[in-house]
Amino acid sequence: MATRRGVLKLVGGGCVLAAVGAGGFVAANGPSRSARTPWREAGQETEFRRRALSYAILAPNPHNRQPWLVRLDGDDALTLYCDLDRRLPATDPYDRQIVIGHGAFLELLALAAAKDGYGTEITLFPDGEDMATLDARPVASVRFVPGGAEPDPLFAHVLARRSNKELYEARDVEAEKLATMMQAGSDFGVSATTIGNTPMAETLRDLTWRAHQMEMNTPATNQESVDLMRIGAKEVAANPDGIELEGAFIAVGKLIGMVNRETLADQTSAGFQQGLDMYEALAMSARG
């Protein structure tokens, strides 16, 4: 039986399997097979909105909280809400990250719908919004328009998405690839650019690392993250949300008592310091 955290809950009844996030920390052998089921079964729903939703739930989102509720409206529409119990009051008090996650959800929904030839008319905050935080009002309403879109080449890469948690190579990205990314990033009325390996890149690496230090060294934000960690394959399979810690290194660390919620919350522990060292190396290897 699927747990609450294993499904996308549809308001009014029904569900679509939800997914363990690719954005969490994955070490060595990757996530549990059962938690990856929605990635393998995406696109198998027969009803077109549910089929699009089976891809949308794979969207990256903060701490992999999967903070969405969906109501199917009539035969050609749906309404997206935020599951307010899945916000991050310490880490994300103004719901900025949660809103970005909903944006990713809507973009994947549109890409998946376009694959089936449906356009999507998306209205953000149709009943208004509280500028300070999310509330019970809808985040978006979506109407599907038959024949209203052509498939987007980006859709082919949806299931290959991952969040890199390894050191970046010390080389520049090829100019052709950068140009392609800048073009894709400029298609929505914004300007995308790159900075290369310049002093600005060094400044951004430093800001990234110092921001991570601040979040980790603030007890409330660190504890919120620790509480959402799924340590080892059994925990990931039981609750395929949150921040997954898996792999051979994690398994050994858990066995010898180095990797557990107590040590990860203890700023004086070796496990806590190793986590900081790992993220510093990641941040400082990033390229512009």
Residue locations for each model-derived region?
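Acidic, surface-exposed loops and disordered segments
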Residues: A2-G288
